Swiss-Prot record:
<dbReference type="GO" id="GO:0006275">
    <property type="term" value="P:regulation of DNA replication"/>
</dbReference>
<dbReference type="InterPro" id="IPR010921">
    <property type="entry name" value="Trp_repressor/repl_initiator"/>
</dbReference>
<feature type="binding site">
    <location>
        <position position="194"/>
    </location>
    <ligand>
        <name>ATP</name>
    </ligand>
</feature>
<feature type="binding site">
    <location>
        <position position="196"/>
    </location>
    <ligand>
        <name>ATP</name>
    </ligand>
</feature>
<dbReference type="GO" id="GO:0006270">
    <property type="term" value="P:DNA replication initiation"/>
</dbReference>
<keyword id="KW-0067">ATP-binding</keyword>
<dbReference type="Pfam" id="PF08299">
    <property type="entry name" value="Bac_DnaA_C"/>
</dbReference>
<keyword id="KW-0547">Nucleotide-binding</keyword>
<feature type="region of interest" description="Domain I, interacts with DnaA modulators">
    <location>
        <begin position="1"/>
        <end position="91"/>
    </location>
</feature>
<dbReference type="GO" id="GO:0005737">
    <property type="term" value="C:cytoplasm"/>
</dbReference>
<dbReference type="GO" id="GO:0008289">
    <property type="term" value="F:lipid binding"/>
</dbReference>
<keyword id="KW-0963">Cytoplasm</keyword>
<dbReference type="Pfam" id="PF11638">
    <property type="entry name" value="DnaA_N"/>
</dbReference>
<feature type="binding site">
    <location>
        <position position="192"/>
    </location>
    <ligand>
        <name>ATP</name>
    </ligand>
</feature>
<keyword id="KW-0446">Lipid-binding</keyword>
<dbReference type="InterPro" id="IPR018312">
    <property type="entry name" value="Chromosome_initiator_DnaA_CS"/>
</dbReference>
<dbReference type="InterPro" id="IPR003593">
    <property type="entry name" value="AAA+_ATPase"/>
</dbReference>
Amino acid sequence: MTMKGGVASQDFSAAIATACEPAANVWSKVCVALKRELGDAAFGSWIAPAMLREAATGDVVLVTSTGIARDWIRRSAWRRIGELWAAHDATGRRIDLKSRLEFEAAAGAYVEATPKAVAAEPIEIVLPVSTDAPTVVAPSAKSPRTQGLQERFTFETFVPGPANEFAHAVARRIANWADGHFNPVLFHGPYGFGKTHLLNALAWEAMRNAPEKRVVYLTAERFLSTFVRAVMDRQTAAFKEELRAADLLIIDDVHFIAGKQSTQEELFHTLTALVGEGGRVVFSADRPPSAMTEMDAHLRSHLSAGLVCGLEPADRNLRLGILERKIQTLGAAHGFEPSIRPEVMQFLADRFTDSVRELEGALNTLSARAGEGLSRMTLDEVQAILRPHLRSGEKRITIDDIQKATAEHYGMKQADLLSERRNRAVARPRQAAMWLAKQLTTRSLPDIGRRFGGRDHTTVLHAVRRIEALRAEDSALSHDLETLTRKLRG
């Protein structure tokens, strides 16, 4: 009986251990299977960066850094994740999927909150070593001062160029705790121009240079949600104290609170208090303060009082530089040769001109599909993979549109582009228009030639090659092509 009792006791203990198995252990087992089934590229791009978080209630949430990653997982892997989780988790815990912003909004998380106020902590995931699955370590729990910051956004990974070199220099100066003559500082530019990268890099560098100083980084959306929660919980005094104790306060996307009166008032008082006490404040927005018509006039005035620094669209050389840096990062992360065919690189730089994020997203798509074969992908293969994305919401551009825009830009008549005139004042704009037609439409070379006064395809091919060669050395021509491309794409 004793032996039986001993066996029963051991079985019972094993059952209890299994039932109480930490979520991190369960997720590690799920990841081993997912990595084997999805492959290194897809797993590394979409699953590995996600973090498992466990709340005090026992609920488990897989948190992705972006909504795009969340959507990919939901579409491509979520059903399988659910099956694997159910198979390995004896307790039957429910696992949910959220983007970082969704999770933080739901939890009321705050970048500088004390440990007691944090609703959930990241769980470190270590995949067991096996013959078919190398060890993978997910990011460990961040200290409160670094929550909300993205480790990949540093000055080392930021590519400066004419479009952002002034903003880059200003951010570097702030991060070095140089004199705060301009305070506050506001960086502005449309979505995808590098503002968030710059602010993250600034925060990381400022903390590295002065570990004893208090740096607070948060998005305007988190500022709003945390303020609302503080009001509801009657904790506004603690909220104010946390912010106003900062040596450097960084708020991303401040335009988000435009029209939200009480939140604007709180930010206004925080700003004036910090500046008055010698603290430094940095904002980003999608437009300059003068264009924030829904913003409170007093707050808008204070945002304008320091240094307003715009980020311009990345030119072609900067886009190529960003692609090169991104390819090196992907190669280092996934263990393959960081290279890509020149014609593919040029295609990406020429087609994704509106946003650096769109440019990086296109490269991520190719990397996820090709993995180690990225360097071998042909231009036709790349165009086939990205074609659905290129069609999405893209304005249809006609050769007539191109001719009209080119003629207007160079101060000439559209008929001049179709004429037989060969003097440089006409020939160069005509060649530029042919190059644009090749880049922005799906028309064949013979068709383009017919629409330029009945010229043959060899004339068009010569024009395209001539412009391709010239724009690398002629900055004025390169600027003209950038301007026309943006105008045509709306």
